[in-house]
Curated annotation (Swiss-Prot):
Cofactor(s) for this UniProt protein: K(+)
The name this protein goes by in its record: tRNA modification GTPase MnmE
Subcellular location: Cytoplasm
Assembly and binders: Homodimer. Heterotetramer of two MnmE and two MnmG subunits.
Biological classification of the source: Bacteria, Bacillati, Bacillota, Bacilli, Lactobacillales
Bound cofactor: record note: Binds 1 potassium ion per subunit.
Binding site for K(+): N233, T252, I254, T257
Organism annotation: Streptococcus suis (strain 05ZYH33)
Family annotation (SUPFAM superfamilies): P-loop containing nucleoside triphosphate hydrolases (SSF52540), TrmE connector domain (SSF116878)
Biological process per Gene Ontology, one example term: tRNA wobble uridine modification
Length: 457
């Protein structure tokens, strides 16, 4: 019986729905043989590898032509999965792609699990775990900078850094073993201790520098979580619609219209801004609105940036003052909306510079984008070309654990602990880093990671 890891799998690799092209993918030992049974055209057994071949998809049981197709034929090992791969390019549409997929399954292929093509690429050594995870980051990237960061990881920038560090740790452990087992001079113990101290500090500095990129990397991957807050009916939803340049939120003069949290993305200087339009934070007896208010408060706590909208045409209210107090953070921008009306707000009572806007007349909206750029990009140097950024929570957690192991080595050295005992923590650091690339990752973790991928990838 062919095991699950080595049978031939099939899946639709393009999004379901109408489109110009649909692709049904096969990977495995029998990919060419199975595809040949549903293809009328050139003999796939004799076509060159990495060739595109015109023909028709047919039902072998009836001879009925299903579609005019182009078949991409790629032979192992020079494929994404390092197996034989067939890609059947059909006209886009749910019916035709699904019919061809069902034919392939009837001819002996198995329906692929989510992420199974990439999993096979990993199991066959085509990519490591960080590169496999980067595949989904490329797919999910919302801006060009997020995409470039993911592509660098896919190309192996993070893998190379981790692998080089693991090799250096291994070399250090080997040298310690040699010095302990075969001492060639009297002060070998002192020299070995100094070697471990020097190398450990070097590894620690490298990993801590990498951790410092985590905040920026996470922003590139997930966006700047931006909560738009303010009391009801000050123009929050109108601001959201203006930034998005489309109508996403209901806008009325009725307080409490936004009853839930609305999330949308907008591209600011190549970095995704995750805009969260919150329900107006106020005391209310309406149960549905009250739930929205509670969610708004939670969004406020988790935000990287707060856009506080105040009504410039009215004096400050107690609610305004409360919002100013609870949103007092470094990355806050106070917006005075409705400046097209007579200004009555007490600007001298506001704690910082404000931006005067009129969402209705689209005035000074560009100043908001410039301020965000100043807060996150210019001051922090958010994106440096060719830099490696940590953006994956799993990677961040593991590197934090690796740094803790190195701290344990240094703490042991300070109290005079024998070097051979400190090898345990240094070895643990090496193993933890291996979990990042997949060299030391448990099977359960690998299965879980690939289950989060989309079907057909």
């Amino acid at each position: 019986m062919i095991t699950k890891e080595f049978d031939t799998i099939a899946a639709i690799s393009t999004p379901l729905g109408e489109g110009a092209i649909g692709i049904v993918r096969l990977s495995g030992t029998d990919a060419f043989a199975i595809a040949s049974t549903v293809f009328k055209g050139k003999d796939l057994a004799t076509v060159p590898s990495h060739s595109l071949n015109y023909g028709h998809a047919i039902d072998p049981a009836t001879g009925q032509v299903l579609d005019e197709v182009m078949i991409g034929a790629m032979r192992s090992p020079k494929t994404f999965t390092r197996e034989d791969v067939i890609e059947i390019n059909t006209h886009g549409g749910i019916a035709v792609t699904n019919e061809i997929l069902q034919l392939l399954i009837r001819q002996g292929a198995r329906m692929a699990e989510p992420g199974e093509f990439t999993k096979r690429a990993f199991l066959n050594g085509r990519v490591d775990l960080t590169q496999a995870e980067a595949v989904m980051d490329v797919i999910r990237a919302k801006t060009d900078k997020a995409m470039h960061n993911a592509v660098r990881q896919l190309d192996g920038s993070l893998s190379q850094l981790i692998n080089d560090t693991r090799q250096e740790i291994l070399n250090t452990l080997a040298q310690v073993e040699v010095n302990i087992d075969y001492p060639e001079y009297d002060d070998v113990e002192e020299a070995t201790t100094e070697l471990v101290r020097e190398k450990t500090l070097q590894f620690q500095a490298l990993l801590e520098n990498l951790l410092r990129t985590a905040r920026r990397g996470k922003i590139l991957r997930e966006g700047i979580a931006t909560a738009i807050i303010g009391r009801p009916n000050v123009g929050k939803s109108s601001l959201l619609n203006n930034l998005l340049r489309e109508e996403k939120a209901i806008v009325t003069d009725i307080a409490g219209t936004t009853r839930d949290v609305i999330e949308e993305y907008v591209n600011i200087k190549g970095v995704p801004l995750k805009l969260i339009d919150t329900a107006g934070i106020r005391e209310t007896d309406d149960i549905v609105e009250k739930i929205g208010v509670e969610r708004s408060k939670k969004a406020l706590e988790e935000a990287d940036l707060i856009l506080l909208v105040l009504n410039a045409s009215e004096p400050l209210t107690e609610q305004d003052r409360n919002l100013l107090a609870i949103s007092d953070m470094a990355n806050r921008i106070v917006l005075l909306n409705k400046t097209d009306l007579e200004e009555q707000i007490e600007v001298d009572q506001l704690p910082e510079d404000v931006i005067r806007i009129s969402v209705l007349q689209n005035q000074n909206i560009d100043q908001i984008e410039e301020k965000i750029n100043q807060l996150f990009f210019e001051n922090a140097g958010l994106v440096e070309q060719d830099a490696t950024y940590l953006s994956n929570s799993r990677h961040i957690s593991l590197i934090e654990q690796a740094v803790q192991s190195l701290h344990a080595v240094n703490d042991g050295l300070k109290v005079g602990m024998p070097v051979d005992l400190l090898q345990v923590d240094l070895t643990r650091c090496w193993q933890i880093l291996g979990e990042i690339t997949g060299d030391a990752a448990p099977d359960e973790l690998i299965t879980q990671l690939f289950s989060q991928f989309c079907l057909g990838k």
